[in-house]
Amino acid sequence: DGKVDQYGFACGMNTSDIGAMQILNAYYYSALWQNGGQVYNDDLKSVSFADEAGKEAVTWLKGLTSYMNEDFMSLSWSDAFSNVFGAGKAAFGITRSSQTDGTTFAETYPDLNWNFVTSLKNKDFGTFGATDCLTLMSACEDKDLAMDFIKYVTGSEFMTAYHAKCPGAALTESEPYVGDEKMEKIYTEDKDKWHGIQVGPCGTQILNQLAADFQGIMSGETSVDKGLKEAEDYANGLLDEYWANK
């Protein structure tokens, strides 16, 4: 019919339904880490995402736009995966992983022939892995009790029972894998391919600005150099002010 509806990469850069930083989780961090980059310098006093590794990573992502669905700026990342990749209209897509994807995808996308990689590799592997923590606060009235509770709920016995009902990544080496056989390698063979985000000062402001400039680069509103420079200047200004008061 003359209509192009087959693409190389299913992508969605609209953040109206999930927040700006989700596009960093889905697309940006992996490219940055795989090219040897990081968000912050090691001393956390300045950012490094606009160095040569960072520029190369974003330039590579920008180059993929010619292989994306034309409406990538108006779709969310999840809509792009379900409506483009899930419909069999793209060769590659990115979504959150789950230990039950083998089961749920068979129900949601019954005609889709799919497989997955946990991470691509350039200079290194690297894919976003969400990390949460239980924190013992200095104001806690009974620190021993709180620590005992943390150890209990993160221990193998409790988490084995919990994950039997709600499949998720094991927290300890002694906890057995629970989930689809197809997805097991994410948590066994590929566990060294995950990265967590660096914890640094002013993180929310820095990453929200970076996400906005990343959108601008991908949409063509600004160049790679200008977009990253704007995000870098904003971030380093915040960090200078933060550290001046320490």
Task: Label the predicted regions.
Residues D1-S16, G155-C166, L238-K246:
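Bilobed periplasmic-binding protein-like "clamshell/Venus-flytrap" ligand-binding domains
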Residues D1-V47, A90:
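Extracytoplasmic/periplasmic solute-binding protein
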Residues N35, D42-L75, S119:
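Glycine-centered hinge/linker elements that transmit conformational signals in sensory
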Residues T59, G63-Y67, Q99, F105-G168, ...:
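Extracytoplasmic/periplasmic substrate-recognition and gating elements
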Residues F72-A87:
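Short helix-initiation/N-cap motifs at beta->coil->alpha
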Residues A91-R96:
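Paired acidic/hydrophobic, glycine-rich loop segments that form the ligand-binding mouth/hinge
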Residues P110, W114-V117, H163-G216, E241-K246:
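Long, aromatic- and glycine/proline-rich binding clefts that accommodate carbohydrate-like moieties
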Residues V224-N236:
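Short, well-structured alpha-helical segments that form the helix of a local strand-helix-strand
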